[in-house]
């Protein structure tokens, strides 16, 4: 059964799969499930009450060429070893895209281990993932067209994750990380940008030409 999880306590049931699938340090996983899971969404596939496949949608407010829009960072995409290659992930993404369109989310982004895993679903590389952070937020706002807006929650989490990285206990990243994006509601994207793109691909081509800053802070 495919379902959306929004309740904090219910989200804890996905931790087992998270730790099976990813090599993040225990201290980071503790932080993720106590803090990041306060306001994110999860789309899961369950069998007999057990989560066998999942993805997480972590919310961010993004400056999209002068317009503040809600977006999601797609993370923790995983399926149990025994149930891979059975279509669970395809169905989870299908449900996620339905929810995102219903919510009128212009686009979402992710950091892939391999681009080919997501390209067939309409995700395309839009920029490199920045590992050397620009500390001056004003400079970011002056220089870039697309970036995450730093509200109080963002700053608190950024500082917490800085601490983990300083202790070498941060999230494990792939080599040469990139950011991929997908247009999830073309009408909302056109409204936010003042454009009139007729296809997702056309909108992504336009987005790729912009100066985009997405850093370890996510």
Protein language model annotation of sequence segments:
Residues 1-53, 58-59, 66-69, 73, ...:
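Short amphipathic alpha-helix that is part of the acyltransferase structural core
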Residues 60-62, 82, 115:
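Short coil/turn motifs at secondary-structure junctions
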Residues 74-84:
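A short, internal acetyl-CoA/4′-phosphopantetheine-binding micro-motif in the GNAT/acyltransferase core
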Residues 83-95:
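Conserved acetyl-CoA pyrophosphate-binding loop and the N-cap/start of the following alpha-helix
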Residues 93, 98-112:
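Conserved GNAT acetyl-CoA-binding A-motif
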Residues 101, 123-181:
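Amide-forming acyltransferase catalytic core, primarily the GNAT-like/NAT-type
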Residues 107-132:
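Long, hydrophobic, well-ordered secondary-structure blocks that form the structural core
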Residues 176-218:
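C-terminal functional modules
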């Amino acid at each position: 059964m495919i379902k959306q999880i929004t309740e904090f306590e219910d989200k804890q049931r996905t931790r087992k799969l998270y730790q099976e699938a990813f090599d993040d340090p225990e201290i980071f996983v503790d932080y993720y499930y106590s803090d990041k899971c306060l306001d994110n969404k999860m789309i899961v596939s369950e069998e007999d009450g057990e989560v066998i496949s999942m993805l997480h949608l972590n919310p961010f407010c993004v400056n999209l060429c002068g317009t503040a829009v809600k977006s999601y960072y797609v993370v923790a995409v995983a399926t149990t070893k025994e149930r891979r290659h059975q279509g669970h992930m395809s169905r989870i993404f299908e449900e996620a895209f339905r929810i995102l369109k219903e919510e009128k989310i212009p686009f979402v982004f992710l950091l892939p281990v391999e681009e080919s895993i997501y390209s067939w679903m309409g995700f395309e590389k839009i920029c490199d993932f920045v590992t050397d952070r620009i500390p001056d937020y004003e400079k970011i706002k002056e220089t870039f067209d697309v970036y995450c807006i730093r509200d109080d929650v963002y700053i608190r989490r950024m500082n917490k994750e800085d601490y983990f990285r300083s202790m070498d206990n941060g999230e494990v990243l792939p080599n040469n990380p990139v950011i991929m994006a997908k247009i999830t509601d073309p009408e909302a994207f056109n409204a936010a940008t003042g454009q009139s793109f007729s296809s997702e691909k056309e909108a992504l081509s336009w987005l790729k030409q912009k100066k985009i800053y997405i850093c370890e802070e996510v």
